[in-house]
From Swiss-Prot:
It holds the Pfam family Bac_DNA_binding. This is DNA-binding protein HU-like. It comes from the Bacteria. Keywords: DNA condensation, DNA-binding. It comes from Rickettsia conorii (strain ATCC VR-613 / Malish 7).
């Protein structure tokens, strides 16, 4: 499983020119922006990674709806 801290460590290892705090701030900024975009019902498209969007789902045996995040991966994600 990839956690936020794992991601920060890997990016920091790859980019030695940035401090770990700078990498953490950058990752936090990106994740906050993605989170806010989904809250505003915006579709997020990251080429060669996938699309994120909000879908409405109906509760079973109820007339109420809820929002859920939908992910669609690209066809070439696992191709070499």
């Amino acid at each position: 499983m990839i956690t936020k801290n794992y991601l920060i460590d890997k990016i920091h290892d790859k980019l030695n020119c940035l401090s770990k705090e700078d990498v953490k701030d950058s990752v936090d900024l990106i994740l906050d922006y993605l989170n806010e975009s989904l809250k505003k019902q915006k579709r997020i498209e990251i080429r060669n990674f996938g699309n994120f969007s909000i879908r409405k789902r109906k509760f079973p045996e109820s007339e109420k709806f809820y929002n859920t995040v939908y992910y669609r991966m690209p066809k070439n994600l696992f191709k070499e």
